[in-house]
């Protein structure tokens, strides 16, 4: 430092006269005294750095204590879901915000993120997977994606299959085999059956093609990279898909009943009728002997409104593969649903706007899904009584104090947001008014919200189904869930969210049941119409008592569901 000062002075005084030399001498003396200056400056700088860091920590603590962050969402200032500015912000490249956007390897990388924002943004809500998928499942999904790319619409293999389908002549060896899923029934049923059909395709090395129906492309993103899963508009059988039934000559059940095809004959395609009204011959689909016949058929057309996966777990030919794919049996729909089902940007906008406005900044989110199977839309007092009896008895919601106007508890109250979904607004209004008119006994602040109330189910209306899909997804983002018996709407929400819900028993004679609800054994949906047949013994049997991981459902005594051993 001394040499630097001397050089500066030398430049300023090139003549070097005596007067200036005296000044230089004085300055040299001064600089000699400042040899310890760097140490002093360093100490001062260190003091300011430490002070700044301490201030930052104290400021952060004050923010956290004043407004505790939610476990399941980031604050509205960082959700980045400003739809009017475009959902596809580059800020989503941040590793911290994405929070393992690939869900532990379940999802494939390489998609155009802006085309389907929900695929990678769902992790922002803190709703990662409930558990870790097996490495075998992940590897099989990657292999399936490669097969789908090789065999998908308009590939060489697909074009060959379509050509042979038109001629009725199939070569003995085909590179690709297909299962075509027919869009059928309500949205909840369609979601459950879509996952069922995909698992069947995975088990049988087939490629899944999805009938777009009237609205599937408006609801769901493409799940597989580089190839569509939707049946092309020029598929030869498109005009017949909605007409197939049990009387069709290509129906598997009718083929067995009439013995119209021998084992040596391979039809160009077979129609599988697996809907709730299927008969005993149709149900033989779940026997290994019939799978041996079907494995040679190049194209299977499937119509179902049932989540039939539990019965696949009872088939010896699939047993080992399923055990390897899903060591935890209750997470089949959870893993496959999170892999396959990504809301389109329109639906995702509904989800994030509502979540950010009403659910993001609370301590706990509670979902209550009310479905009444009655010709009268309601609301019904006995249903309201049952909902309140369940939620208060199980301490899901706090009771109210009808004797006081103001709660006198001190401290920062805990906040709860209650999301109610129902075709009627009556239940929402009653619960909302209760928490408006009276304080809670616990001092908690309870907000009641309902996104829509359509009055009745409108299966074929596009925006109705978009809102229904958004509400299922919102329910899946809650911390505690209450669902209605028999409802596929609730099954989808619990499965996607990895939640074991409290299930409201189905009322009889318009009377609230006692007890009002029961905790689910697992997060898996219920198969409402399973077969009760022992394929090996060729006689009827209780299929809910054959293996430890397939049991009868809580809400439907004859149904089947997967549970952990």
Swiss-Prot record:
- Please list the residue ranges that the record places on the Cytoplasmic side of the membrane: 1-43
Location(s), subcellular: Golgi apparatus, Golgi stack membrane
Give UniProt keywords alphabetically. Answer: Cell wall biogenesis/degradation, Glycoprotein, Glycosyltransferase, Golgi apparatus, Membrane, Signal-anchor, Transferase, Transmembrane, Transmembrane helix
- Please name the InterPro entries in this protein's record: XG_FTase (IPR004938)
What are the TM regions of this chain, as residue ranges?
44-64
Into which family does the record put it?
A: Belongs to the glycosyltransferase 37 family.
Name of the molecule in the record: Galactoside 2-alpha-L-fucosyltransferase
User: What would be the name of the gene that encodes this protein?
Assistant: FT1
